[in-house]
Each structure stands twice: as C-alpha cells, then as structure tokens.
From Swiss-Prot:
InterPro entries referenced in this protein's UniProt entry, alphabetically: Costars (IPR044302), Costars_dom (IPR027817), Costars_sf (IPR038095)
SMART domains the record matches: Costars
Native organism: Eutrema halophilum
A single BP term in Gene Ontology: regulation of actin filament-based process
Alphabetical keyword list: Acetylation
Residues found modified as N-acetylmethionine: 1
Protein's UniProt name: Costars family protein ST45-2
Cited Pfam families: Costars (PF14705)
Length: 92
C-alpha cells in the first residue's frame, strides 16, 4: 500500500471511529485510533501515516509526533472535504 492509499484508509477509519462535528469535520483521539484492532492490522506505521496526512492538510493535530500513552488524549481532526467548485454562470 502506498502513502496515498494509507491516507485514504486513515480517512475511512477516522470516519468509523470519530465523531462528526457541526462543521463537517470528524474528531477522534490518538488513543482510540492507536488501540483499535482494525487500525493495527491496516497501518504498519500509524504515526507516519498521520504525519503524511497532516503534511497534506487532510488532518490536524497539535505537535509533530504522537506517542502511545503520552498522547492518547490528543484530538486528531479530519478536515471536512472542500466544497465543490461553483459553476460559472454563462453570460449572454
């Protein structure tokens, strides 16, 4: 699995485990993700996938590195998808 596929899987898992927010984002704590059996089977390096997703501005969390135990209560936010582009009205 390449990085893009792992990020897509990460998004799916955050949707599954997280809570939908009023702005369309999803929130989940690092501990919930890290300790989930399904996530453990999918991601060889969850922290690396999270960092790659953060770099692409798909997720947000404080700091650069999350560690098991120490950061279990840190919230990870899956940002809402961008709105579809507005259709340009044809002028006559």
């Amino acid at each position: 699995m390449n990085v893009e596929e792992e990020i897509q899987k990460l998004e799916e898992e955050i949707h599954r485990l997280g809570s939908l927010q009023s702005d369309g984002s999803y929130k989940v704590t690092f501990g919930v993700l890290f300790n989930d059996d399904r996530c453990a089977n999918i991601f060889e390096a969850l922290v690396g996938t999270l960092r790659a997703a953060k770099k692409r501005k798909i997720v947000a969390f404080p700091g650069e590195l999350l560690l098991q135990g120490v950061h279990d209560k840190v919230e990870i936010t899956l940002r809402p998808p961008p709105p579809p582009p507005q259709a340009v009205a044809a002028t006559s």
